[in-house]
C-alpha cells in the first residue's frame, strides 16, 4: 500500500518538493528521515507539527542569531558505540562534540527568548532537552579534544604530553643536523630540502654521487636519477622517532578507548537526543522553506476551499481558486492545454504538502480537508500507437484505487476513462463515478465527455466546473468557473494551428448534423448557466461599486469629523490662552493689592468687567469640552482639570450628584460637566499634609475652611499666606481659618497677619456654636 502511495505522490511531483525542503537541513540523516516520513492523517498530529514549524519560523524571523550549523552524521559512531568495548576515531568524537555543542547553543537561544509573548518555546526546549549527563560528557570530551586542530589537547594526560615533548625536541635536533649535512653536500643533491620517506628523514642524492654520503638507501625515484639516503649520523634518531611515534599512537588509542567508553555509558541518552534533533531538523527545514516561499498553514476543515493557490514548482504560475462548496465530486471540462491537468496536480500536491506539514502558497482564508489517502490517475502519456496499452494501464491503476478508496480519500482522475471508444468510455466513467459516489469519496476529474457534463446536472453533490480560456490567444487563464461545463474549442484550436479553413468548416457541419437531443439540451443548459453567471457578475460589480461608494462616504465623514475636531482644538487653544493671560493679570493685581498700590473697590470693579469676558470665554470652552467629553466615564484616580478655575487635581470620590476632586490640599466638590480629563504629573510636597474642603457651586460663593491646628507658627503663617493668594486668584471673598483655642498664641499670630493685609475688609470669631474663638471668619 505504501509503495502505491509513494507512486501517486511521485505523479504530482511531491518528492521534488521534498528535495527542495531537504536543502535546508543541517544533517544528512535528516534527508533520509524526511524521505521516510508519511503524510499525517489526524488533526492532532497535524496541529502539533504546525505549531512546531510555526514556532521555529517565528523565532527565525523575529530573533537574531538562531543556531543553524551543519552537523555531520552520527549514525555510524552511535551504532558502533551501542556495543561494549567499542572505540571510535577522534573524528567521530569531534562530531559528537559539535552536535552536543549545537544542541547546547539552541537551548541557550531558546532560554534567551523564552519571555517573548505568544511563543511557547518550552515545547522546543523539551524536545531538545540536554540531559546533565550529556553536558558532563560534552565538557569531558572538549577537555581532551581540540575540535579545530582535530588532535588531543596537551596538559590533560601526562603520558601523552611526555611523548609529545620528546618527539618535538628530537625532530628539531634531527632537522638541524640534516640541514648541516645538506649545506656540506649541496652539490651532490637534487634538492636542498629535507625529504620524508617511509617515516624517516632522508636526503635526495644524485644517483651518480651514491657513495658521497654514507647511509641507508630508503627509496629510489621512478626515473632512477635520485636516491633517498638516510645518513648514518641520524639513523639512531630516526629509529627513536619511529618508536616514539608508535608509542604516541598507542597512547592516543588508549585515550580514545577511554573516551569511547564514557560515550558508551551515555549512548542511549545520546541516541534519543540525536533522533529528536533529526526530527527538529526536519521541522526547521519546513520552516525555512515556508519563509523562502512565503507559504502558510491554512485552517483544517471538513471542506476543501482553496483561494489564490500557486503551484510551488511552476515559475510565474497563475493563481488558482477552487471552491466546490459542499459538493464532493467536481467534473472539470475545457479545452486541451486549458489548465485542467495543472489545476488537478496543484490541488493534489498542495493537499499532500499540507498533510506533510509543509507551508503552502495559498490565500489565508483557504481551508483544507484531511484525507486518509490521495489517489491519482494522470493521463499524460496518450498517443495513437499505444492507446490500448495506456488504457489498460489506467484501468489497472483505477482498479487498485477502487479497492482501497474510502469516504475520506481524495481521488483524482485526469482525462477520465479516455483512450477507448467514446460511448464505452463514457459508460464506464459514469459507472465508476456512481461507485465512488456511493462510497462518498472526494473526487476530482477532468474529461471531454458530454455524458459526464450532463451527469453533473442530474446528480446531487456533483458539480461541473470549466476552465476559462482566452479565445484570441487560446491560452489558459486558470480561472475555474463552477456550475458551468467547459467547451473543448476543438475547432478554434484547429484554426489556430492553421488547419485549412474549409476543413474546419466541414468539421463543424458534421458536428452539427450529429448532435443528439441530449447534446442540444446540454447546450441550452450551458447557455442558461452562462446567462445566470453574467447576471451574477453584473450584480457583483454593482455590489463592489456600492461598497466603494460607502467607503468613500465613510472616508468623507471621517474627514469632516477630523476637520471639526481640528477647529475645536484650535478654538480651545485660543480660549485657554485667553484664560491664561487673564490669570496673569489677576496675579499682578493681587500683588499690587498686597503692596497697597491699588484701591480695593476700584480693583473689584476692574475684576467685575474682566469676569464678564472670562465668563463668555469660559462658557465656550466648557461647551467644547463637554462636546469632546460627552458622558465621560470618570473613575476614582482619574486626573482632571476644573474648567472654571483651570485648577488640576485627582478624583478621590464619586457620588450620584457630585465628584470630589483633590486639588493640592483642597477637596473640591463639582459636577461632571465642570471637569475634563487631563494628563499631568503630580508634584510631591514635603511636610505634613492638611485637608481643605471646598464646596463648589455655581450659584453661591465659594467658602473655604483652612485648618492649621497643630502647625508651628512659622509654618502656619507661611502656609496661610499661600492659601490666601489662591483664594484671591479664584475670586473668593470669604473664608474660615481654624486655629484652635489653646493658649491663643496661634490665634494672635493669625490676627497680626490679617491686620497687615490691606485687602482684608474685616475678620471676626465664629459663632460659639460654630467654633467660637477657635475659628476666625475672614472677609475680603
Curated annotation (Swiss-Prot):
InterPro entries: DNA_mismatch_repair_MutS_C, DNA_mismatch_repair_MutS_core, DNA_mismatch_repair_MutS_sf, MSSS, MutS, MutS2, P-loop_NTPase, Smr_dom. The keyword Nuclease applies. One of its GO terms (molecular function) is rRNA binding. Residues 706-780 form the Smr domain. Keywords: ATP-binding, DNA-binding, Endonuclease, Hydrolase, Nuclease, Nucleotide-binding, RNA-binding, rRNA-binding. Transmembrane segments: none annotated. ATP binds at residues 334-341. The keyword Lipid metabolism does not apply. Its EC number is 3.1.-.-, 3.6.4.-. CDD domains: ABC_MutS2. SMART domains: MUTSac (SM00534), MUTSd (SM00533), SMR (SM00463). One of its GO terms (biological process) is rescue of stalled ribosome. It is an enzyme of class 3 (hydrolase). HAMAP family: MutS2. Belongs to the DNA mismatch repair MutS family. MutS2 subfamily. Homodimer. Binds to stalled ribosomes, contacting rRNA. Endonuclease that is involved in the suppression of homologous recombination and thus may have a key role in the control of bacterial genetic diversity. This is Endonuclease MutS2.
Amino acid at each position: 500500500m505504501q509503495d502505491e502511495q509513494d507512486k501517486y505522490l511521485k505523479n504530482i511531483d511531491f518528492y521534488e518538493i521534498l528535495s527542495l525542503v531537504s536543502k535546508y537541513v543541517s544533517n544528512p540523516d535528516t534527508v533520509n528521515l524526511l524521505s521516510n516520513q508519511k503524510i499525517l492523517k489526524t488533526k492532532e498530529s497535524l496541529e502539533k507539527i504546525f505549531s512546531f514549524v510555526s514556532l521555529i519560523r517565528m523565532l527565525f524571523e523575529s530573533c537574531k542569531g538562531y543556531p543553524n550549523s551543519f552537523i555531520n552524521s552520527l549514525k555510524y559512531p552511535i551504532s558502533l558505540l551501542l556495543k561494549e568495548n567499542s572505540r571510535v576515531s577522534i573524528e567521530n568524537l569531534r562530531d559528537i562534540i559539535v552536535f552536543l555543542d549545537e544542541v547546547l547553543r539552541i537551548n541557550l537561544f531558546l532560554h534567551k527568548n523564552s519571555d517573548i509573548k505568544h511563543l511557547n518555546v518550552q515545547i522546543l526546549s523539551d524536545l531538545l532537552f540536554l540531559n546533565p549527563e550529556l553536558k558532563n560528557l560534552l565538557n569531558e570530551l572538549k577537555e581532551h579534544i581540540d575540535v579545530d586542530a582535530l588532535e588531543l589537547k596537551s596538559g590533560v594526560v601526562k603520558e601523552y604530553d611526555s611523548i609529545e615533548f620528546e618527539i618535538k625536541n628530537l625532530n628539531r635536533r634531527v632537522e638541524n643536523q640534516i640541514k648541516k649535512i645538506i649545506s656540506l653536500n649541496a652539490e651532490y643533491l637534487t634538492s636542498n630540502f629535507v625529504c620524508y620517506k617511509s617515516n624517516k628523514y632522508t636526503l635526495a642524492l644524485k644517483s651518480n654521487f651514491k657513495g658521497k654520503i654514507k647511509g641507508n638507501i630508503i627509496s629510489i625515484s621512478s626515473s632512477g636519477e635520485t636516491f633517498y639516503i638516510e645518513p648514518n649520523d641520524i639513523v639512531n634518531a630516526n629509529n627513536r622517532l619511529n618508536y616514539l611515534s608508535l608509542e604516541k599512537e598507542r597512547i592516543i588509542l588508549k585515550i580514545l578507548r577511554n573516551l569511547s567508553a564514557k560515550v558508551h555509558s551515555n549512548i542511549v541518552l545520546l541516541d534519543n537526543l540525536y533522533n529528536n534533533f533529526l526530527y527538529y531538523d526536519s521541522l526547521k527545514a519546513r520552516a525555512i522553506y515556508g519563509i523562502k516561499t512565503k507559504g502558510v498553514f491554512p485552517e483544517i476543515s471538513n471542506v476543501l476551499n482553496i483561494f489564490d493557490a500557486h503551484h510551488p514548482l511552476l515559475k510565474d504560475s497563475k493563481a488558482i481558486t477552487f471552491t466546490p462548496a459542499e459538493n464532493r465530486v467536481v467534473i472539470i471540462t475545457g479545452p486541451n492545454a486549458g489548465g485542467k491537468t495543472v489545476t488537478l496536480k496543484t490541488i493534489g500536491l498542495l493537499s499532500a504538502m499540507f498533510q506533510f506539514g509543509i507551508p503552502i502558497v495559498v490565500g489565508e482564508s483557504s481551508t483544507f480537508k484531511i484525507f486518509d489517502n490521495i489517489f491519482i490517475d494522470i493521463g499524460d502519456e496518450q498517443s495513437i500507437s499505444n492507446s490500448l496499452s495506456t488504457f489498460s494501464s489506467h484501468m489497472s491503476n483505477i482498479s487498485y484505487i477502487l479497492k482501497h478508496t474510502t469516504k475520506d480519500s481524495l481521488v483524482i482522475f485526469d482525462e477520465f476513462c479516455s483512450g477507448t471508444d467514446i460511448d464505452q468510455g463514457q459508460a464506464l466513467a459514469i459507472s465508476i463515478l456512481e461507485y465512488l459516489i456511493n462510497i462518498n469519496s472526494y473526487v476530482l476529474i477532468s474529461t471531454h465527455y458530454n455524458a459526464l457534463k450532463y451527469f453533473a446536472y442530474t446528480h446531487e453533490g456533483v458539480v461541473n466546473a470549466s476552465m476559462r480560456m482566452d479565445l484570441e490567444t487560446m491560452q489558459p487563464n486558470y480561472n475555474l468557473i463552477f456550475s458551468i461545463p467547459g467547451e473543448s474549442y476543438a475547432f478554434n484550436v484547429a484554426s489556430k494551428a492553421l488547419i485549412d479553413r474549409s476543413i474546419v468548416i466541414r468539421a463543424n457541419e458534421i458536428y452539427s448534423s450529429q448532435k443528439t437531443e441530449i447534446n442540444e439540451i446540454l447546450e441550452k443548459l450551458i447557455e442558461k448557466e452562462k446567462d445566470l453567471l453574467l447576471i451574477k457578475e453584473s450584480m457583483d460589480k454593482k455590489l463592489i461599486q456600492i461598497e466603494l461608494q460607502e467607503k468613500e462616504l465613510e472616508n468623507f465623514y471621517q474627514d469632516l469629523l477630523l476637520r471639526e475636531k481640528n477647529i475645536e482644538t484650535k478654538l480651545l487653544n485660543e480660549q485657554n490662552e485667553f484664560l491664561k493671560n487673564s490669570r496673569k493679570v489677576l496675579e499682578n493685581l493681587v500683588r499690587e493689592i498686597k503692596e497697597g498700590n491699588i484701591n480695593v473697590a476700584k480693583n473689584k470693579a476692574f475684576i467685575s468687567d474682566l469676569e464678564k469676558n472670562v465668563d463668555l470665554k469660559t462658557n465656550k470652552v466648557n461647551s467644547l469640552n463637554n462636546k469632546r467629553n460627552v458622558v465621560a466615564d470618570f473613575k476614582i484616580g482619574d486626573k482632571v482639570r476644573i474648567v472654571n478655575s483651570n485648577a488640576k487635581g485627582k478624583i478621590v470620590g464619586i457620588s450620584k450628584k457630585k465628584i470630589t476632586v483633590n486639588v493640592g490640599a483642597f477637596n473640591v466638590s463639582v459636577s461632571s460637566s465642570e471637569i475634563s480629563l487631563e494628563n499631568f504629573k503630580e508634584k510631591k510636597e514635603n511636610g505634613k499634609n492638611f485637608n481643605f474642603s471646598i464646596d463648589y457651586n455655581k450659584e453661591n460663593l465659594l467658602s473655604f475652611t483652612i485648618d492649621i491646628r497643630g502647625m508651628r507658627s512659622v509654618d502656619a503663617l507661611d502656609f496661610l499666606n499661600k492659601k490666601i493668594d489662591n483664594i484671591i486668584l479664584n475670586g473668593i471673598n470669604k473664608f474660615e481659618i481654624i486655629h484652635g483655642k489653646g493658649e491663643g498664641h496661634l490665634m494672635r499670630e493669625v490676627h497680626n497677619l490679617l491686620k497687615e493685609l490691606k485687602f482684608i475688609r474685616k475678620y471676626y470669631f465664629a459663632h460659639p456654636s460654630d467654633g467660637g474663638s477657635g475659628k476666625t471668619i475672614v472677609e475680603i
